Amino acid sequence: MVTISDVANLLSRNTINYSIIDYPEKKKSIDIITEEQNDKRRILVLKINNSTSDRRNFRILFDLKKISEVTESLPLIIDDNIEDDVVSEKDGVFSMNLYTLERSLRGEKIFLLKTRGGIFVRVDSKKLREKREEKNMSLGELSQRLGVSRISVYDYEKEDSYVSIEVAEKLIEIFGDEVIGDIIKDYDSNTKKKKELQSDYNEEVKILEKLDRVLSDANYKTVKFNFTAIDMAAIKGSEKLIFCTEVNTLANSLKKFNEANKIASKINAKLLVIAKSSKTSKVYEKENFNVYIYNDIDKVVDESS
């Protein structure tokens, strides 16, 4: 069984400054914390051999997540039960064995993520797009070679994703192993994610506020929704309009729009999609949605009247 001393020795061999936390004597959530080094290596918050009851395990995970949010550090549980070269994740906290930690500290890529659904491979979205464009390969061509939808490939390139081992092997065969990502290096703390989510939320509010202003000026009655597929409805006389904004990924946006279309068809309303950019609007138009980009919201009233 790996010990705190084992981990400390590994950190020392890699010239990483660390402190062992000795309080409390039992039921600790943090055993070791490291120091950030020249912005090249993030802070690590480590718990060693977390073989605790489910209830205490939840509390330990919660503590690790909280300090990660405050420091933008990487929370890690060092667990002998995890296979070599594999990372397990629960509630935003990673688990790996000592060998995998050693490989990561040497700068080697750690790209296998184990979940309840199986083992998946991290993809580097920027590198994937770069390699595809170098080969002058379209999204459609790549999707056919991978055996996935064009929307899936678009999402792979938009945001670092996890793919099946089968898809990863095909990507390596086509582009080389540069397109494979690194779970540890690419880790975003919850703080950063929250900032990104808040930014997305603020952008959605901005879109809906502008839309509401344009429609109200044209004498439409508007209502907003928070917990369904549609974001806003507008009524003027017998005319009924339903509006949807984009969400975090293209695939989720299309799912949202398709569900909103079910509502629109049942109440005899016209569904209008508001896209953030002309690039995504073209994708939605190919799926036969009526689309306006944010800068053209003023045209909604003119073309609906």
Swiss-Prot record:
GO terms for molecular function: DNA binding; DNA-binding transcription factor activity. The keyword Transcription applies. Residues 128-183 form the HTH cro/C1-type domain. It comes from the Archaea. Keywords: DNA-binding, Transcription, Transcription regulation. CDD domains: HTH_XRE. Residues 139-158 bind DNA. SMART domains: HTH_XRE. This is Putative HTH-type transcriptional regulatory protein Saci_1344. It comes from Sulfolobus acidocaldarius (strain ATCC 33909 / DSM 639 / JCM 8929 / NBRC 15157 / NCIMB 11770). The lineage of its organism: Archaea, Thermoproteota, Thermoprotei, Sulfolobales, Sulfolobaceae.
